[in-house]
Amino acid sequence: MVRRQSAPRLEFEAAAIYEYPEHLRPFLSEAPALPGVYIFHSESDTLPLYIGKSVNIRSRVLSHLRTPDEATMLRQARRISWICTAGEMGALLLEARLIKEQQPLFNKRLRRNRQLCSLQLSEQKIEVVSARSVDFSHEPNLFGLFANRRAALQSLQNLADEQKLCYGLLGLEPVSRGRACFRFALKRCAGACCGQETPQAHFLRLQASLERLRVVCWPWKGAIALKESRPQMTQFHIINNWLWLGAVPSLDEAATLVRTPAGFDQDGYKILCKPLMSGQYEIIELHTDCRQS
């Protein structure tokens, strides 16, 4: 008896029924070829469908309209709006803020991480510390930003495996003084637990391997203004402790934004750290009254 094969299960594929979204064409003709943030709106004004950024809003929006994989989002879209910025930095910062505040349906969700942890190295030991108890903007010798304690310990374990560091000396497992750990017998530990390596040498190897993960302390006394310009537009991004407080068209208006942030902004740090430390932007330290001579 021949078993009759069942018909293959049909799966919905947005690309298979893609049609160019003609209802959005009028918005494309008005979209500027400038840097900034764009928003796809549904019939609801309270919940955006998608928020994106680009150095050329018009070009990026056009690419969305021509992408079959985004047919589901495009069918729900009713209008497109945008906010122009002075450059790429402003677009990055504004996009991150709007996504976190408005939680668009088709964006990856960005939320404040209340369990944010890091590894702190001090006095020949390493431990996991939380952003709830330590100021990550100013505390020295922090390495890595992790979603929680478990992720921090896993990263430390991976580092130990790569560098043949001792789990016992790192606090990852119990160790008996003077006795070799189990990993030493497997040649996965260099022997700091049993005198084959000095504690100082072990610590220096740990320190060197962590360096690529170092969290940079906020290097200014207070808030700064980052100047970003293009023809017809200049913005001063006001930043303090790695948190973007907003943008103003002139330094005279900086006082309306300056404040000391509560907590550490992980998204702001990831966006701002490398550009600020590279020297590619003009940085202006703000006085207490925020007026510059």
Curated annotation (Swiss-Prot):
Keywords: DNA damage, DNA excision, DNA repair, Excision nuclease, Hydrolase, SOS response. It comes from the Bacteria. PROSITE patterns: GIY_YIG (PS50164). Gene3D superfamilies: GIY-YIG endonuclease. SMART domains: GIYc. One of its GO terms (molecular function) is nuclease activity. One of its GO terms (biological process) is SOS response. SUPFAM superfamilies: GIY-YIG endonuclease. Its EC number is 3.1.25.-. Residues 33-108 form the GIY-YIG domain. One of its GO terms (cellular component) is excinuclease repair complex. PANTHER family: EXCINUCLEASE CHO, UVRC/OXIDOREDUCTASE. Incises the DNA at the 3' side of a lesion during nucleotide excision repair. Incises the DNA farther away from the lesion than UvrC. Not able to incise the 5' site of a lesion. When a lesion remains because UvrC is not able to induce the 3' incision, Cho incises the DNA. Then UvrC makes the 5' incision. The combined action of Cho and UvrC broadens the substrate range of nucleotide excision repair. This is Excinuclease cho. It comes from Salmonella typhimurium (strain LT2 / SGSC1412 / ATCC 700720). The gene is cho.
